[in-house]
Amino acid sequence: MFTILTMLFILATARVMQYSGMIAAVAALFSVFGPVYPFFAPMLGALGTFVTGSGTSSSALFGSVQMSTAASIGANKYWLVAANSLGVATGKMMAPQSIAIGLVAVDEAGRDGELLKKVLPYAALFIIISALVCFFGQYVWAIFGIA
């Protein structure tokens, strides 16, 4: 029951963001980065998942931001939405909700901080690799005429 309510509120928030012009405003802010923005795109997905604990929620909230930013900087919108999804995986590995659920499952509740400290270096490495793939990948795909 609570899961359904949470998803409804997340989707409602995404719609409010769209109708109020927040998505366009945030996209305009991110477009300042210009052609370098795809490097930062996975970080937005990771942040969304870290905060909400859900990849679906992060995609609902920030997928439109990625598409609008892509239009602003002349990048491939599918590439940036995929970059957001790549960041979602990173955010999920360090999301407090995911860590708490995992620790409860193995009867180690209360050791959240300890596990987060162990996960952060791997998450940081993964997000840096993801950012590099997203940045350089857009040019590689463009060379082959795919993007």
Label the predicted regions:
Residues 28, 51-85, 122:
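Hydrophobic transmembrane alpha-helices that form the pore/transport pathway of multi-pass ion
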Residues 5-17, 34-65:
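Hydrophobic alpha-helical transmembrane segments of multi-pass integral membrane proteins
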Residues 18-35, 64-65, 73:
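Membrane-interface interhelical connector segments
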Residues 1-7, 37, 121, 126:
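Helical membrane-embedded segments and adjacent short helical loop/helix-boundary regions
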Residues 89-147:
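Juxtamembrane and boundary regions of transmembrane helices in multi-pass small-molecule transporters
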Residues 6-8, 36-50, 73-97:
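Alpha-helical transmembrane segments of multi-pass membrane proteins
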